[in-house]
Curated annotation (Swiss-Prot):
<feature type="binding site">
    <location>
        <position position="277"/>
    </location>
    <ligand>
        <name>Zn(2+)</name>
    </ligand>
</feature>
<keyword id="KW-0862">Zinc</keyword>
<dbReference type="InterPro" id="IPR036180">
    <property type="entry name" value="Gelsolin-like_dom_sf"/>
</dbReference>
<feature type="region of interest" description="Zinc finger-like">
    <location>
        <begin position="255"/>
        <end position="280"/>
    </location>
</feature>
<dbReference type="InterPro" id="IPR036465">
    <property type="entry name" value="vWFA_dom_sf"/>
</dbReference>
<protein>
    <recommendedName>
        <fullName>Protein transport protein SEC24</fullName>
    </recommendedName>
</protein>
<keyword id="KW-0472">Membrane</keyword>
<dbReference type="InterPro" id="IPR007123">
    <property type="entry name" value="Gelsolin-like_dom"/>
</dbReference>
<dbReference type="InterPro" id="IPR029006">
    <property type="entry name" value="ADF-H/Gelsolin-like_dom_sf"/>
</dbReference>
<dbReference type="GO" id="GO:0008270">
    <property type="term" value="F:zinc ion binding"/>
</dbReference>
<dbReference type="InterPro" id="IPR006895">
    <property type="entry name" value="Znf_Sec23_Sec24"/>
</dbReference>
<dbReference type="Pfam" id="PF04811">
    <property type="entry name" value="Sec23_trunk"/>
</dbReference>
<dbReference type="GO" id="GO:0070971">
    <property type="term" value="C:endoplasmic reticulum exit site"/>
</dbReference>
<dbReference type="GO" id="GO:0000149">
    <property type="term" value="F:SNARE binding"/>
</dbReference>
<keyword id="KW-0479">Metal-binding</keyword>
<keyword id="KW-0968">Cytoplasmic vesicle</keyword>
<keyword id="KW-0813">Transport</keyword>
Amino acid sequence: MAAPQEGYPPPHSDGQQGYGQPYGAPPAEADQPVAPPPAGAPATGGPTHGGRKKRAYAGQAFEFGSGANAALGGQLPGGGTYGGYPAPPQPQGYPPVPYPGQPAQPAPETYAAGEQLGAGGYQPPGPGYPAADVSQITQQMGQMSMGGQMPGRAPGATSLNQLYPTDLLAQSFNVAELDFPPPPVILPPNASVTPSPTANCSAKFVRSTLNAVPTTNSLLKKSRLPFALVIQPFTSLHDSEDPVPIVSDQIISRCRRCRSYINPFVTFLDHGHRWRCNMCNLTNDVPQGFDWDATAQQALDRWQRPELNHAVVEFVAPQEYMVRPPQPLVYLFLIDVSYSSVTTGLLATAARCIKESLDRIPNTDRRTRLGFIAVDSSLHYFTIPRDGSESSDPSMLVVSDLDEPFLPIPGDLLVTLTECRENIEIFLDKLQEMFQNTQNGGSAMGSALRAGHKLIGPVGGKLTVLTASLPNIGYGSLEMREDKKVLGTSKESSLLQTGNSFYKSFAVECSKQQISVDMFLFSSQYQDVASLSNLPRYTGGQTYFYPGWNAARSEDAIKFAKEFSDYLSSEIGLEAVLRVRATTGLRMSTFYGNFFNRSSDLCAFPAFPRDQAYVVEVAIDETVTKSVVCLQTAVLHTTCNGERRIRVLTLALPTTQSLADVYASADQTAIATYFSHKAVERTLGSGLEQARDALQAKIIELLSTYRKELAGGSVTGGGLQFPSNLRGLPLLFLALIKNLGLRKSAQIPTDMRSAALCLLSTLPLPLLIQYIYPKMYSLHDMPDDAGVPDPATGEIVLPPLCNLTSERLVPYGLYLIDDGQTQFLWVGRDAVPQLVQDVFGFPDKSQLRVGKQFLPELDNDFNERVRAVIQKSRDFRSRGVGSIIVPQLYVVKEDGEPGLRLWAQSMLVEDRADQGVSLQQWMSLLREKVIQ
């Protein structure tokens, strides 16, 4: 048969079909997909001249000597960790994780957690204390052969993850598994248009609760599992720390109908002149210039374009993506100058920190503007002259009418950092002196917020609030609502609601004007975090809470200074919107996180932070007929350098008609993240008790469903069956119920609870899981390679993780417990003097003070290793998240101050405590309910 014209490749002779073409069908000339050349194929001829100019761009690309979608397969087997996925011929299992004492099975080397430790380290003082038994987990997991064809799976379909049942009661959970990657996403061969290992979205940007999607809503309902995405569009505070590919030629190809962006999962047709949308199937023209490098004036190799090789890309947006010129970065600081702010040292520390961070505030385009309003019972505005003016002194204007605070000349109140740099420094030096003798206890912060809204409303920007008082006069004034008698009762939930409707309605006004609010709260008394946190919640901001903060304690001052400096340096996005599109049949139904839901599917962010994650629930509205679905997140934003950009994240997932596939590919940490957001919503809507009950009911429902549908209804030998990839879920649910934000207790101050709820609904997934189930390391007997750099990577090696139970604590031990916000260094009551000497520099434990502190830098190997472990445990960047938080370290003695000890012990979520059950009781309760 003669080759078709135009140099188009002949149909396959080996029986492999181009995707989208029925088996054995003759090639449909204009509608057959076009594939990239095989890896390493030489580029074919340059542009053909003399024809129409429109096609000169594309002339180079499509004369390959090999069949469409030839053996390279469109997907590398076992692609890179960034987002590649294997496409193996055999059923792909998600193998059970090896436990101590279990016959070895290959597993990622980095997770060799739970190995028996050597005899090194600090041993017990005498024979009286047997070393803790690390594990009695010996049962080999049943590696079930699924035998033949999976029910509900089409013959010849790609084999998805295999289901490995495990008995939850027979072996304790290896907590290192909480850091494991999710079950792999297994796509059919040739699912993507290029064989790039980064063609599918990395789990650090987007995680799905289900890595195999049910084709029908009835199957999803039958599974009782949630279908949701956990989205973290930015994974670092600064672009340089985690760069993504940038498409800067302003050629953005989008589907005419559904407005999806071209991505690695589209199909090219008509000799590459058109592309078929993988969301809605519409055929679109490839834009002019798609294969042309305008800068170099030469043809481009289409298959090298970032948007066809990378699931995460950023497009530089042309003019039509702007309603107005890109917004400059604006920070208006509302600083509390009342008596409590001055006496705790907040005013002085904040002023000094802003001054020392001026060089870190993004200002590449030299348009960044700053303003300052000081707040007590009046509002104090400051005009700062330009550098080089006759007078460098700032002038202050005091406004006492809080009902209608008029604005002095706005132009002088919001000044350009570049033009007024020196005079801003002079002002910040003087600010503290202006109020050092104040006795004013009033706080008109609500009125200050309104004034700030008026001031920056025309341009938008950040209102950064630093306050150590409860707003008690003017707009939005709040009262002391906390009543210790109602803590732990059903009435407590009302204290978690806002105490003044001003904060919600004002937040919505801010969102409309592209104003975002961040709250830094420092009170040693009740401050009504529940009300104040509404401002960040609806404006894309965050609430940072520093209870009992005082600058006289260097630990407090240094923690805030580091965090606030990183906050100011963060390369936030401005005037942003987020939208998630998906394959026909799927719909985004509910959105969770700090933003304003402007329409059914559009989330508005006056500022887009870099240290938060969002959860989007997905509904299946109609039967999905495709073998692969795609979900594409787009964030349109202005960078803080004044460039309009669109960050696009495309996730492709296989579909299935089999319930076993759905369970085998479910991601336990993404599911826990989804239910964390649901629990916060339930708490604020219905109450704490209802939120806890809903969590318990949900885990019972999942266990019962699995037993009934997939375990044949059996409860063998008193066990409790669940898939091995979900075996941490009952523990995570218990830990969530016992978290500071949700647990039943009469001891938790309302502000602490409200601040915890803010974290539970904003933290990126790795930090949220750690906040729910903290990390504990045994330091006194850590292996020799722990606390020192790994020779291969240079990264500090952490000791093996321990389960959070007092059974793991030996009386002579030293342990680090870290929930990502706070670190506890637990010193056992019988710690040997040498250990205390090496770590703390005291010959006797009685001299060791407890409470927040920095570890001394001592000249011995063990002290260095302990400090390295503490530091590495704070290294969020290596875990693919941006965060300004520097966890505070508390030294706790087992026989020391009871309040501190109880706080540290509340992290041991597997123990019975306060009004919470132990893990053992919890598992017995679940089993009882499941077999009822």
